[in-house]
Amino acid sequence: MAEPFKNMYNEQFFDLFTKDLKLVIDDFDAHGFVSQVMDDEWEGRELKQRCIHITTILKKFLPADYKEAIAKILELLDHVKSTRPDFSVIDDTKFGLMLEYGAILDNYVEQYGLDDYETSVKAIEKITQFTSCEFVTHPFIIKYPDKMMKQMLVWSKHEHWGVRRLASEGCRPRLPWAMACLLYTSPS
């Protein structure tokens, strides 16, 4: 039987993730982070629940100010891209070698960034170049329908294929694991 996808979040992953976080957050407490993430309920959580839990714990270890936290997240992406290009490069044949990081980082924007449109849109644009952020866009489309649909149009012409893909996939009304986004209903 195949290994459950949720098990990609394991000790090996957290060892790498926390080492990377320590490089961008001077006082990052890797042991404290991992012990809070891998709590007594860890094994019972499914993939999406694990992502949300990791993100919730990560918030405690990032700067309290959302803009500063996003700056650290983007710094983390830059670090990974510059030190492990094989790990961070995606193309149209292999989408998301950074899936494990991306699912956490885009979830951070979804959970905590809805009230800071500008910072979040810039973060989404950058993160989606490493992994898909299509699940993140629905709450923003619902809260900021006109602004976000204009942004989708801008992204549809972006130089990076992942951002262009987000412009298409991110405004689909129904996506697995994403909240429904039914702004426009068919008259039929």
Which role does the model predict for each range below?
Residues 1-186:
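Surface-facing alpha-helical segments and adjacent helix-coil boundary elements at the starts of domains
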